[in-house]
């Protein structure tokens, strides 16, 4: 009897049923939204580790092939005048494999693009300025690093300051927030690179003071240019690249256009400097034969492009700082492969290299844990907001 008693404090069966029907779409939408978010997060993590794999693979292969190139051309000898030459060729090769990325971009768009992208004239102007800026920076740090690693015995230590510049630039340009895990990651990955220096084939012998000073300044400005390029990339993804563009397409588009501009600049430098004349001599005198000379240059260019694609992908997915941390964490891995492949000066895998590898792994893991905590925090916030609604 009380079941049918009208009271403001009670809800009738009919009203309760109506409320249940009204809440069904909301519950269904919530479940679908949760599943979609879980899928997006899982795909994001997969992309993070794939891009990190690109960076490590590209770093290892490029280091091995660059050592191989220096040995086979005789540039590893201290008394060889060619030791300080070929910097424009190196910077050219570092960017020249962009057609391979352009092909992948066209293939991706033909398979997965559902509609054509339209851009306003103002958007086109911003994109043009972005790609020009990145292309100039790409060519600058490619050439400066090529000079630095062949002229300065302290190259690796100066190279380590790249993390400091990236941290400063990303805090100013990208408003990046730091926490203890990110700071720990920066320290560990910096240590990993700082103590892993070895006698590579392109490692300079003791030379005149002016050459050492010249190489040191080139290394320094190269770190500034590289750090700035990463932060400008992140700004481009945040402010310039259209939101309708897929992440994969945006990454390949940025890498292709910036590398194309850098290649043109380095090609001009190659001819203006006269270094193009040395290519024929290297081709004729390559110790393992002409075919392997061509294959080594192609492989070196592709390896650099794979690493660059991974770096740009990490900037898009996470941040410029994380991209740099992964690059530094990969250095000990590349160094160990160099020791295994060439055994320079009876070098072996000792405590320093083992410690550097461990520091690199822990530095990478520390930043990944920071990303994991940030994602969990976002999920909790979104769930709380959904409950309020």
Swiss-Prot record:
Residue stretches spanning the membrane: 46-66, 88-108, 127-147, 153-173, 181-201, 217-237, 251-271, 297-317, 322-342, 349-369
Record keywords, A-Z: Membrane, Transmembrane, Transmembrane helix, Transport
Entry GO CC: membrane
Subcellular location(s) of the protein: Membrane
Entry annotated with the keyword Transport: yes
Pfam families associated with the record: PUNUT
Topology in the lipid bilayer: Multi-pass membrane protein
Superkingdom assignment: Eukaryota
MF-aspect GO terms: purine nucleobase transmembrane transporter activity; purine nucleoside transmembrane transporter activity
Similarity comment: Belongs to the purine permeases (TC 2.A.7.14) family.
The protein, known as: Putative purine permease 20
Gene name per UniProt: PUP20
């Amino acid at each position: 009897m009380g079941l049918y008693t009208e009271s403001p404090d009670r809800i009738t069966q009919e009203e309760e049923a109506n409320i249940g029907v009204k809440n069904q779409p909301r519950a269904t939408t919530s479940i679908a939204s949760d599943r979609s978010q879980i899928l997006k997060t899982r795909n994001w993590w997969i992309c993070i580790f794939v891009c990190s794999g690109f960076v490590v693979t590209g770093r290892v292969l490029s280091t091995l092939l660059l050592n191989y190139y220096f040995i086979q051309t005789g540039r590893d000898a201290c008394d060889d005048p060619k030791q300080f030459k070929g910097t424009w060729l190196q910077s050219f090769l570092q960017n020249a494999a962009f057609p391979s990325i352009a092909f992948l971009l066209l293939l991706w768009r033909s398979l997965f693009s559902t509609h054509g992208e339209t851009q306003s004239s103002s958007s086109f102007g911003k994109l043009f300025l972005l790609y020009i800026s990145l292309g100039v920076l790409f060519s600058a740090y490619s050439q400066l690093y090529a000079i630095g690693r062949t002229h300065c015995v302290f190259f690796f230590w100066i190279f380590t300051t790249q993390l400091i510049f990236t941290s400063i630039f990303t805090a100013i340009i990208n408003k990046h927030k730091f926490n203890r895990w990110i700071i720990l990651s920066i320290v560990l990955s910096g240590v990993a690179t700082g103590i892993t220096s070895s006698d590579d084939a392109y490692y300079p012998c003791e030379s005149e003071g002016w050459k050492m000073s010249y190489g040191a300044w080139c290394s320094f400005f190269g770190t500034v240019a590289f750090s700035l390029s990463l932060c400008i990339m992140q700004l481009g993804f945040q402010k310039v690249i259209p939101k309708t563009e897929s992440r994969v397409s945006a990454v390949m588009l940025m890498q292709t256009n910036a590398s194309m501009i850098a290649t043109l600049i380095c090609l001009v430098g190659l001819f203006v400097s006269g270094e193009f004349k040395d290519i024929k001599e290297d081709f004729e005198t390559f110790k393992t034969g002409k075919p392997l000379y061509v294959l080594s240059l192609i492989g070196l260019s592709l390896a650099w492009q794979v690493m660059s694609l991974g770096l740009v992908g990490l900037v898009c997915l996470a941040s410029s700082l994380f991209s740099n941390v992964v690059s530094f964490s990969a250095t000990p891995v590349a160094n160990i492969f160099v020791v295994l492949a060439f055994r320079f000066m009876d070098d072996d895998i000792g405590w320093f290299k083992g410690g550097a590898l461990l520091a690199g792994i822990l530095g990478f893991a520390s930043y990944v844990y920071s990303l994991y905590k940030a994602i969990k925090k976002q999920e909790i916030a979104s769930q709380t907001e959904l409950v309020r609604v």
